[in-house]
Structure formats: C-alpha cells, structure tokens
Amino acid sequence: MIILNKQYELFSSRVKSLLNRIYKAAVIDDLIEKLFSLLEPHLGESDKEDFDKWSENNVLLITYGNSIYSEKDNSPLTTLDRFLNKYLIDTITGVHILPFFPYSSDDGFAVVDYLAVNPELGNWQDIQRISSQFNLMVDLVVNHVSSHSQWFEQFKQGIQPGCDYFIEVNADLDISDVVRPRSTPLLVKVDTANGAKHVWATFSPDQIDVDFSNPDVLLEFIKIILFYVQSGARYIRLDAVGFLWKKVGTPCIHLQETHAIIRLFREILQMIDPAIALITETNVPNRENLSYFGNRNEAHMIYNFSLPPLLLNALLQGRSEHLKTWMMSMPPAPIGCAYFNFIASHDGIGLRPAEGLLDRDEYTALLETMKKFGGEISMRKHSGKAESPYEINISLFDALKGTVKGEDSWQIQRFLCAQTIMMSLEGIPAFYIHSLLATHNDHEKVNQTGHKRSINRHTWDYEKLEKQLNDPLSHHSMVLKELCRLIQIRRRQKAFHPNATQYTLHPLNQALFAFWRQSITRDQSIFSVHNLSDQPQDLRLTDLNLVSTDAWIDLISGDKFEDLHDVYILQPYQSVWITNKFDSAAEENLPSCYYVCE
C-alpha cells in the first residue's frame, strides 16, 4: 500500500533517483516504502545541511577499546574513559573507537554481531558514557561480515534471510580483473546444506562479502546505521567501502553503485540528523580517493591517505619537493566536506596512495629504511601470482627514529615535527593513541598473533603507562605533554579551521616545508613552516611576505618577529606557526616548547 502524504512524496523524490542507479525498476517502489517505514520515526524536524559540523576546535583520537586496560576496572572501556578524562579532556573533542563488537578475527573487522558490544570490552553503557563527553566515531564494516555471524550460519544452513545475503560464484570464474588489497584467495569454498559453494571474500576467508545487489542487505545496514546514531554516534565510518559492489568483468572497486549507495547513506543521515558526518575509508591512489567527495553529495570526510607515506618519506630524506607537489595538486575540500588528516592508525602506512608520487629510488629507500627500523612490509596480490607492497607495518614513533642515513638522536623532535605538520594542514586532525603515547614497535605481539599489523597495536597496562607518564624524563611523557600543548594552541586558531584557505609556499630552501593558512573571515594568517632536516636551516622572513603593519609571533615558541627582513634559524625538525592574530593573555603564559626544554 502506497503511503500518500507529503512527507512520503518528499522522501521518495530524494531517494528514488539514487535507488534507480542501484537496483532494477521493478523493485524500486516497494523498496522506497520499506525505507520510509523504517526511517519515518527517526526523521528530524530540519534536514537543512549543517555547514557548522566542524571547526578548528575538532580533534579526534583513534583507539581500540582495549588499547589501555587495568585489572582495577570492570572493563577496558571503563579504563579508556578514565584515561580520556584524566589526560585528554581538554585536548580532544572526538573519539574513534575501532570496532568494539563481537568479532572472530582482524582485531574487530570481522564482525559477528553489529548490535552488541564485545563483553570483553564492556557494554553499551560504557560506549554511551564516552559518547556523552566526546563525539563518537563508529565503524560500519559494510563490505563483509564474520564467517561466524548469524547471517553466514544461515547461509550455510540454507535458511532465510542469510541464505540470500552472500555472493555465490563458480569456482572457475575469471577474476583476473578484480583489484585485491590482500594476497589471500578471493573465493572461499564453503560446505553448506545444499553442497559445496564458493563465496566472495575480499579480505580473508573469515571475512565474507555481503551482497548489496539484494535490497534486503541494504535495508539491514540502514537499520544498523540508525542503531548507531541512537547509541550516540556522531561520525559513521564506512570501512573498506570502495569494494562494496561486485560486477564480474570489472575491477570491483569504486563502481557507480558503490558511489550511489554512499550518496543514499548521506541523504538518509541528512534527513535523520544533519549534524552527523559520514566518512569513507578508501586506502587507494589519491585521485581515486578524492572521488568519494562526489559532487559534495557523498562523504562528508575522506581520509587523507597520501599524507602518511609522503610525510614519512620527506622526513627520511630531509626534502620537501614531493610534499609540495602533492599539496599543490590537492583541491580544497568542497563546501560541507573536509579532509580527515592522520599519519598513523591501527593499520599500516598505506603505499598505494603514494603511487605515482614518489620516484623508484626513494620508494625503495623508504621500504629498506623501515625494515632497518624494525618494520614489516605487507603485500597484496595482483592478477596471476604477482605481489607488490601494500603497506608498511611499524610504529610511527619508531619509523621516525632516524633517516635514510640511519638512526640518530633526533627521534622525538622528528616525530613532533611530523605531528605538527599533520595538525596544521587543511582538514580535521586525528591522532592514533600510540602516537600520542609514543609507543614502540610491539614485536612480541606480532610473534603472539602472527599478524604484521600487531606491531602497532600494543596494549598498555594502565598502571605501567601512568608510571611512564608521571616520569618527566620518559619519552612517553614528553611527547604526550608537548602534543597536548600544541593541540590546545591549535584549537584556538581560526586559521586552522578545516576549510580555511591553504596555500603552498616556496622558500628557496628545499629542507623547509611551508604553507599559509588564512581564516575564513580573513582576519588571521598563520605561516606554518617546518624544518624537515637534521641540520639548522635559515628561513628568510621575506620569503613569507609578512604584512609589515601587523605584529607577528610564533605560537609555538613565543618568539616575536619585529624585523621582517631578518633571517630566522630553524633548529633541526623545528616547526613555527607565525601568526598576526593571537591571544595576548595566552601569550604571556605560553609554555616553553620542547626545544627550549632541551
């Protein structure tokens, strides 16, 4: 029965064209009715686009629910909440808690039950307590489910609804065109009540891809989105979404149906709560990644995946040219959209986003240096038996323990320089918990799990961590203290709004990486300049074109610039934020920076 009212007609007009891009015409009207019945109780009073989703104040933490644990607490999520309130309450505004659901592998990304909290981590009350103080990012693992999930058990038994939720193919199907992020077999043989079948598994034999060509699968995931929003999510992260739609004879990545489904998700969130942001995780070459902004009608945010490998290479080489070339090629994020900046996460440092951006010699030197610093290289499979490097698995702190020349004594300064560059760029900054804590490679965990990614997934005992953080000479303490200070300074600068103007500067010194940020209201400028090398470097202030009628100060060190024709000496890996607008009261109490402490 068709529901004849204005609200339904408006809803239909907004989703029908998108559904027509995904499904056959025969199922569209029925699907619209089901969608409307599902969403009607949740439709908001206003669905006007919220252009104030973010500001310079937004900073996120990326963490597992059990990255820190304590025997004294009831659950790891309770410990996380305790840590956040003690150390980061004035520093971050949002928390991405990596998949906290029951799972069977891949540290949470093989979800058994989307609607439950893993009891080993805590419960929904723990999640909601954190979301009441911080903007919560929740993963929608949209491409696949665990082979131990109820849906897949139903598939094996041949019962509804799961029997229709997965992709069955012939074992001899030509899959040579399919883009692979892993080296495991794409097709997995499964014994079912109806005999042996082969199903699609992009990431691993335990992660079985769901079949979005079945509209009921779409409805299931929209129900999950609604549940996450009701549970406090302010960001919905679409994990591995680029692989969502499969079509034989294509690469099965970035297909038009995938883009249409993302647009549909955005449209639905817009109708439910315009303040919620959708973020896509597509670890692919830069041009492909940018396509997920669509025509400002797909993702609100995309990961800046090219930044980690390019910034790492720049600091290893001590030169800025590749960073500058990349930055000049990056378009400003569309209105209502933003880049999600990071240089470390639970995964490795992706290499595909650096394709075409580094020359062969530097690419080789990057991989060899990371191996020397204790890192591992993960591979992906091409057609046939060929493999190529996919990501570097290493703690970022250890990745920056030296340069291509070898280890040196500048690890902390180099690491802080990397983080300062990241938080200065156009976009919203996100810090992996093991970056804030300057955690070393965890080789013991790699040996325990047999997985290379475990090297950067250390689990801290809270009491042992506190002992380190209470020691002013501990590198963990020094890094956390200085990063918190820098983040708090950054959050007060309008020129660091995620959509504030960004312009690449070209000082004659290639060891310097410099860019200009200007606030949306055009009343604050910040010249963000960074020494990428292990030697002092001259910065000619005339290269920056500082307006002579303004007073200029470095927000990081407190240094004032009175002679605009002077030469300022940047110490190894030093960063400066030279601005014409600052809080004089805050300036008087400006803490000394790490270089002064040294």
Protein language model regions, located:
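Active-site and adjacent substrate-binding regions of carbohydrate-active enzymes
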Residues: 2-598
